[in-house]
Amino acid sequence: MNYDQMLERVRKGDGFIAALDQSGGSTPKALKGYGIDEGAWADEQEMYALIHDMRSRIISSPCFTGEKVLGAILFERTMDGQVDGQAVPTALIEKGVVPFIKIDKGLEDEADGVQLMKPMPELGALLDKAKALGVFGTKERSVINSANAAGIAAIVAQQFDVGRQVLAKGMMPILEPEINIKSATRAECDTLMRSEILKHLDRLDGDTQVMLKLSLPVVPGTYEALVDHPRVLKVVALSGGYARPEACAELAKNRGIIASFSRALLDDLRHPMSDDEFSGSLGTAIDEIHAASLT
C-alpha cells in the first residue's frame, strides 16, 4: 500500500487501530501483565527485546490482519525492528494493516490542570526515518486532568502545532489530548476540549485532514461534531483504563468512533500460552473490539 491507498483504507475501511506503543516507562508494567516479572531481564536492552518478542507474536499471529485491524501504532524501537525477517512496517502493510509511529517523548509536570508534551528536538529526523520505512502517520499524547480552560486551550494548541509539523512531512497525525477518566470534572473537560478542537479544525488549510484519538466521553455523542467535521479523517478512542467489556460497551454508544485500544486488546495475553492459545485469546479480543467499532 502506498500513502494514498493507506489514506483510503483508514477513511473507508472497517476495523480498529491496535495501540502497540508502550514506551520505556510503561514497558515493565506491560511485561508484568504479559506474565514476565521485572527480574526476568538484566538491563534495558533485554527488557526491550522481551517487549519486542511480545509485539512480534501479536503482529505475526494469523488473526492479526487487515480484515479487522485497520492500523497499528508502534513504539520507535518496534518500528526499527523486524518480524519474521521483515521490517515491522513492511510486515504490517503486507497484512493490510496501516502503520503509525508514537512520536511524543513523554509528559511535562502538571500545570493548569494539564500535562503538555515534552519537547521533541529530534522530531524531524524521526519523521524522515518513519516515512522512509513506509509509516503512514503518527500519534502524540498529552493529558487533561481537570477542566481548566487555559490549560485545555494550551494542550489543544500544542497538539495542532506538532500535527502541522507531521503534515508538512507528508504524514497523517493522530492528535491525542487524553482526558483522564478519573477526573472529577470529566464531562466539562469533554465539552471544553471539543470546543477548542473545533476552533483549530476550522483554521486548517484547504482540504487538510487530521485524526483524533480521544477518551470515551461521559455523554455519548459528545464528539459527533468532530466525527462529522470535514477536516477530520477519523476519530478513534483510547480505552483509558477501562477493562475490555466496559471499553467496548462505551465505544458502541458513540457513532462513527472506532477503537484504538492497548490494554483492552492485550489484557488476556500471557507469555506461557501456546501459539494456539495465544491466537485464540487475541482473536477473541480483536472480534469484540472490531464489533464495537462498527457502530
Predicted feature residues:
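Alpha/beta catalytic barrel-like cores
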Residues: 1-136, 144-146, 189, 196-214, ...
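Eukaryote-skewed repeat-based solenoidal scaffolds used as protein-protein interaction platforms
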Residues: 138-212
